[in-house]
């Protein structure tokens, strides 16, 4: 759908939480994600004011019913609502300001340095961290053989993520 839609803030937050993380994750992981979602949303409101337009993708209640099935909807929604309420008011701060808190479910075994990803020194707290269990996660590793004459990696960041690939005469950005 295009355009804007007014949604109660709590419903939007729970919908964002449902979109970003599986309701089957451990409760503490859900709580951590709730804090990240709240921080991101509050930061946007702080920057843009009360009429801020939220652009993060979220699940509507209808989406959640489709995702979980009608029979599991009430139980799962109540679980996310409880997690949201139990973390009420909790946000991530850095130097007295709401922090930018990018999220990814899995890495290639290391998180990335914020400066390398975002191109700015504005987020010095985003440092590389080893995450060895990420590479063991279900569905994380998949191999595909693609035959492309002359394809070669031209650059990688310090965590080993590919940031550039040359195919023939064209150089592609690994970030897009």
Regions found by a protein language model. Give the residues of each.
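Conserved, single-site charged/polar hotspot
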Residues: 1-176
């Amino acid at each position: 759908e295009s355009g804007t839609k007014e949604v109660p803030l709590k419903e939007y937050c729970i919908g964002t939480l449902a979109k970003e993380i599986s309701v089957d994750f451990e409760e503490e992981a859900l709580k951590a994600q709730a804090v990240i979602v709240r921080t991101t949303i509050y930061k946007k409101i702080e920057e843009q004011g009360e009429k801020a337009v939220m652009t993060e993708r979220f699940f509507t209640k209808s989406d959640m019913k489709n995702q979980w099935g009608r029979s599991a909807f009430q139980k799962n929604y109540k679980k996310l609502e409880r997690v949201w309420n139990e973390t009420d008011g909790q946000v991530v701060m850095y130097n007295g300001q709401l922090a930018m808190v990018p999220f990814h479910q899995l890495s290639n075994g290391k998180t990335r340095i914020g400066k390398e990803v975002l191109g700015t020194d504005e987020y010095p707290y985003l440092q590389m961290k080893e995450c060895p269990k990420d590479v063991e996660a279900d569905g994380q590793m998949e191999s595909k053989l693609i035959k492309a004459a002359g394809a070669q990696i031209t650059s990688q960041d310090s965590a080993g993520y590919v940031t550039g690939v040359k195919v023939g005469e064209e150089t592609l950005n690994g970030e897009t």
